[in-house]
């Protein structure tokens, strides 16, 4: 998604200089991935979160939306883990409204096989202590330690 408007910020201050937010034509790259359907823009997710598994692109936010539709799910995050065969594989880190639920069967007809998590982990309380937003980087590091 790229934006251009008359009311955009001039830039940000770095090392004593104003650094422009826009390219030479005045466009700002949001680093969001979007899709346009019938004149309506839908934000799909952050480009920084996109990863590949067996040559297939996985946008974590798309998978998270599907899993979050289950009534027992309070929060879900999809993070990549390194895999020798596929490059990366998706792992779900979840918070439930009660004891953990097996969602691997539930997602089979809702997600493509490459999008289906290979592991389902419960969100640890220590990752929720930093405020409202949970860091994807902290989640990735935590998942790596669980290997």
Q: At which residue positions do the language-model features occur?
A:
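Flexible glycine/proline-rich
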Residues: 14
